[in-house]
Amino acid sequence: MAHVVDSNTLDRIFAEVDRGFDQQMQMLSDLVAIPSCRGEESRAQDFMAHAMADLGLAIDRWKINVDEIRHLPGFSPVMVPYDDAINVVGTHRPSSGVGNPRR
């Protein structure tokens, strides 16, 4: 079942997006200025890890092991070395397991 968001909540969301727009565009500009083609991803990954950590997210990094993903649907043959291919993920871990109290 879809949750309908009232117009006041939508207005607040849009206002917050607008308020942070210039900062978001600067971050995107800084990110795309970093060379990040295959084999050169580490600086861009570090940039994103720092940005996500600044937001309070828990950072997880791991090296891609091609043998562990080879059997997965959609796997594409690897044509370049993955020696420096590191995945970076930021995860929000709430302070409590309680969901939205308004629901």
Language-model regions, residue ranges each:
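Acidic/His- and Gly-rich active-site-bordering loop/insert found
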Residues: 2-103
